[in-house]
Amino acid sequence: MANSLAIENVGEAQIITAEIWQSASSADIMLTMLLESRLFLTSSHHTPQLYLFAASCARRVNHLLQDPRSHEAIRAAELFATNASSSQHLLHSHLSARTAAFDLATTYNSHPLISTDQPNDDDHRSIPQVTLLGGALIHAAATASMACCPSEILNPLRAAETSARYAIKALYYEQLTNDTDSTLISQLLEEEQHRQSQALRIFLGNPFDSKRWPPFTITNNADIDNRVTACTTQQ
């Protein structure tokens, strides 16, 4: 009797978790769910889809990427996800893109330090515009670098989570650079979080109920291009 109740409780918890995943409007919530799932964190089953998700986040800040090495990193992640390139190429692209991000950091090093936390809305106007721009460009470059981070350096799930977080920060600093109204900034970031949540569902399906919502099956580059385009242009 006790065993049957335990099984029933586990089943109910699984259903609730799957429903939370399907309805979540924030990628933060969904990625936290995955990070807290020990089984998922140690599994390589969704690795290709995680690279595609990270690449889609990086493409959202494509307009802020100034170095060809950053653009190459995004494509390297997409190619690796389809077994169209080697792990050595992925590593080389990551290291090159990371160097590009470091180069940007060096360029803006003479300006006031850029905090990894989002500045207070009342404080950002006292920060030089060039510093805010540097924050946008550096976080965008870091997004691209993390999108193709090899698993031997960082777990693909953690790398994807970092890419998503850096992309949000890049867009945030971009809006501060443009002196956008704080209310509008909050709205834009909420929309970006929702867009990322949709991208996770597109690529990963529902890891907590994969029979009903299986992950995206990668067949060719055209499929990838279509999915990535959908993730980067959806409203």
Question: Model-derived features: where do they sit?
Answer:
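Structured binding/interaction patches within domain cores
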Residues: 1-235
